[in-house]
């Protein structure tokens, strides 16, 4: 039942290069194996180039993406849905949703180099005609897509470099009346509850974990750092 799937979501904290859909399993062991299989597939994708400090291009690692997407699928199910991946990077989230049974996946990215990487990764997806890329900057206005979006997923900029950089991502999805929005954000973010309420959404925290930050930029003094993040779910109330 849908309510039971949601409760499970909120309470739960192969050598062939051709990518196939990953079948759902009804038991815990099957879910663990499914997540591991997904993590291997996502980790094998060509990585995000991560060149822009301004765009806060921190890549979502395959293991984290797999854990998060599996939790989303447990509660909201990607099966047969149109999924929008906003600020798609190398396509790890959108392609992950495709593995989990999405009917259509639209990936929006403003970085031309990143779009090229997504296109290379899409080639590895079997029957990839249901995956689409849009080269466009997210600016708070509606993005034209071929059919109604059922679920949006994103790892938006958190506003480290530019204050409120995440707002246009939320405004875009709100303008499109997306019923379910799943996103990653810094655990220190304090504006999310009020943002959700003022736009007619309920905010749920799915779980929290560490987000690894590779030394991709010159201002990083350490080889690798990490920050604490939360994975959230927004549900439209009307």
Where are these regions (language model features)?
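Conserved Rossmann-like nucleotide-cofactor binding loop
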Residues: 113
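Conserved S-adenosyl-L-methionine
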Residues: 87
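S-adenosylmethionine
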Residues: 137-230
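Conserved SAM-binding loop of SAM-dependent methyltransferases across substrates and taxa
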Residues: 90-102
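Conserved beta strand-loop-helix elements of the APE1-like EEP
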Residues: 231-238
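Conserved SAM-binding motif I beta-strand of class I
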Residues: 104-109
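S-adenosyl-L-methionine
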Residues: 9-12, 21-84, 116-147
């Amino acid at each position: 039942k849908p309510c039971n799937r949601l409760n499970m979501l909120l309470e739960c904290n192969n050598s062939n290069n051709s990518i196939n859909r990953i079948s759902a399993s009804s038991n815990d062991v099957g879910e663990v194996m499914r997540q591991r299989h997904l993590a291997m597939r996502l980790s094998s994708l060509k990585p995000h180039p991560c060149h822009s400090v301004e765009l806060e291009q921190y890549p979502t690692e395959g293991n984290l993406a797999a854990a998060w997407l599996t939790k989303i699928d447990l509660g909201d199910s990607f099966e047969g849905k149109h999924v929008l991946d906003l600020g798609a990077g190398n396509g790890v989230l959108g392609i992950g949703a495709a593995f989990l049974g999405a009917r259509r996946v639209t990936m929006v990215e403003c970085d031309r180099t990143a779009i090229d990487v997504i296109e290379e990764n899409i080639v590895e997806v079997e029957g990839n005609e249901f995956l689409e890329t849009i080269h466009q900057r997210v600016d708070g206005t509606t993005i034209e897509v071929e059919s109604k979006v059922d679920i949006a997923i994103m790892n938006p900029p958190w506003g480290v470099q530019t204050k409120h950089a995440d707002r246009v991502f939320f405004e875009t999805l709100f303008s499109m009346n997306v019923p379910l929005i799943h996103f990653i954000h810094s655990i220190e973010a304090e504006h999310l509850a009020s943002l959700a309420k003022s736009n007619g959404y309920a905010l749920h925290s799915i779980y929290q974990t560490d987000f690894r930050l590779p030394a991709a930029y010159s201002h990083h003094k350490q080889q690798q750092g990490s920050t604490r993040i939360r994975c959230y779910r927004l549900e439209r109330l009307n």
